[in-house]
Structures are given as structure tokens and as C-alpha cells.
């Protein structure tokens, strides 16, 4: 926890750094996506014009439309700006808990060793390290499944709030790429770091063939991982927008 911080007195308490955790996130608070009911819509087709209804908070950028991210107006002034960011949202970017545990067992020369490692109490914001850009197709069962991932977005035909991506834009649109709780993810993980199974031949048996010791084994490293991000190796964090090369799965015999 930050006990003292040399900061200009803030207008609102949620902007205060003092009392927050180290490496915490300062984010806009997403309040779902804009819907057609938030606008007065005139015209047809490509000539449609959108005007926010009275009482509906404006976006972080001009020209918001249905499907863009809507943010909570924390200070109630009817607009979204830096005063609506909140300190210490989610968990810190650096894990507060790092752990490992394992098991070793042996019986009549046969043995097995297994080791897990993981982290907890940590969050990441997708795209935070790369100006809002990230590549969600590097990892897991959806690896390289660009088509299925891009389909998980808001469209007029699928005006769902339960999508990964808001309305698509042909260029970077600050309203939708700003660091916010829309992109906040639990970054905890548990990894099966390594497992080894083998057999130590008995000395009595080996003496018959002139060998002092012999062991055969199969070892695997970085075999699997359980996490909530599922787009890139969680142990590497959110650096480089997901383009960092994952830890290799290896086998040794």
C-alpha cells in the first residue's frame, strides 16, 4: 500500500494515489455498450445521424454510436474525461501471490516427480502495453482462429452486450481502446511446470553387465496452463500486445 505520495491534491477521492496498492491500475469504468435506445436516430442507411439523448453521458471521443463502450460518469458532469478514471481497480499488474508446489514419490525403483507453479491476485488490461492494440490469436484452442475471434464483436445484427469486442472501426478509436474495465482480465494462472517419470535399475542387476548405475526417464516441461486470459502465455504478461513468444513445451527422454 502507498502510505505517502507527493501528489497535487485531487478534486475527487477516486483520483488519490495515497492508500492504493503498488502497481495498481488506473482505469475508466466501463458501463456496457451504447445501445440504439441511447440515441435519437434520423435518416436511413449510410445517411443515418446519431445524437445522444438528453441525460445519456457522452463518450470519451466524439462520434460515439451504438456498440461503442459506455463509461461511468463518476463526477456526474455529463462527460467522460480524465476525472472519471479510478485508481486501484482490479488487482495489481505484478502478482501479489507467487507460489509453487510439487510431489515426489518412489517405489521399487520407479519414481515420479511433478511440480506446479502459479500466481494470484493480479490483473492485466488487454492492450495496455501497446497503445490499445493486442493480438488475441496466439494461444490455446483458439490459436490463429482469427475469424472466430473477430466474429465475437458487436454488430447491428448481433447487438449483444456479451461480446469481447465493441463496434469495429477502420482506425484506432480512443473511446474503445482506452484502458478500462472492459479490457480488464484476471491474470492468475496455474502451470504444470514439469513432470518426470522414470526408473532406477537395481545395482544388483546392473553388476551383471558391468554398469554401476542406470536410469531411464521421460521429462516434460511447460505441459499445460490454466488461466482466464486464454489468448497468450499468461506468465509472459501483456507485453508487446500478445506477440511475445510463449514458453516452449519440451520433452526429454
Where is each model-derived feature located?
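Repeated loop/turn-to-beta-strand initiation elements of outer-membrane beta-barrel proteins
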Residues: 109-113, 204-205
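Transmembrane beta-strands of outer-membrane beta-barrel pores
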Residues: 1-2, 107-109, 118-122, 194, ...
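Membrane-embedded beta-strand positions of outer-membrane beta-barrel proteins
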Residues: 114, 216-218
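Conserved small-residue
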Residues: 1-91, 142, 146, 151-156
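Membrane-embedded beta-strand positions in outer-membrane beta-barrel channels/transporters
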Residues: 100-102, 194-198, 252
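Extracytoplasmic gating/loop element in the C-terminal half of outer-membrane beta-barrel translocons
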Residues: 64-66, 120-215
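Flexible, surface-exposed loop regions and adjacent strand-edge segments
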Residues: 6-15, 129-139, 231-241
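Outer-membrane beta-barrel "beta-signal"
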Residues: 247-253
Amino acid at each position: 500500500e502507498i502510505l505517502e505520495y507527493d501528489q497535487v491534491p485531487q478534486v475527487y477521492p477516486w483520483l488519490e494515489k495515497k492508500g492504493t496498492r503498488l502497481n495498481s491500475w488506473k482505469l475508466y469504468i466501463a458501463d456496457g455498450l451504447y445501445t440504439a435506445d441511447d440515441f435519437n436516430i434520423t435518416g436511413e442507411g449510410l445517411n443515418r445521424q446519431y445524437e445522444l439523448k438528453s441525460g445519456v453521458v457522452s463518450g470519451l471521443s466524439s462520434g460515439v454510436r451504438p456498440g461503442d463502450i459506455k463509461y461511468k460518469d463518476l463526477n456526474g458532469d455529463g462527460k467522460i474525461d480524465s476525472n472519471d478514471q479510478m485508481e486501484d481497480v482490479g488487482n495489481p499488474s505484478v502478482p501479489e501471490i507467487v507460489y509453487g508446489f510439487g510431489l515426489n514419490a518412489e517405489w521399487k525403483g520407479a519414481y515420479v516427480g511433478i511440480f506446479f507453479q502459479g500466481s494470484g491476485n493480479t490483473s492485466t488490461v488487454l492492450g495496455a502495453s501497446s497503445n490499445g492494440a493486442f493480438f488475441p490469436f496466439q494461444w490455446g484452442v483458439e490459436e490463429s482462429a482469427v475469424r472466430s475471434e473477430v466474429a465475437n464483436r458487436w454488430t447491428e445484427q448481433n447487438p449483444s452486450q456479451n461480446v469481447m469486442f465493441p463496434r469495429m472501426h477502420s482506425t484506432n478509436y480512443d473511446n474503445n481502446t482506452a484502458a478500462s474495465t472492459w479490457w480488464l482480465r484476471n491474470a492468475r494462472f496455474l502451470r504444470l511446470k514439469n513432470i518426470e517419470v522414470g526408473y532406477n535399475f537395481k545395482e544388483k542387476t546392473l553388476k551383471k553387465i558391468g554398469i554401476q548405475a542406470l536410469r531411464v526417464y521421460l521429462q516434460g516441461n511447460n505441459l499445460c496452463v490454466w488461466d482466464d486470459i486464454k489468448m497468450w502465455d499468461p506468465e509472459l504478461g501483456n507485453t508487446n500486445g500478445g506477440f511475445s513468444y510463449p514458453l516452449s513445451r519440451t520433452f526429454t527422454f
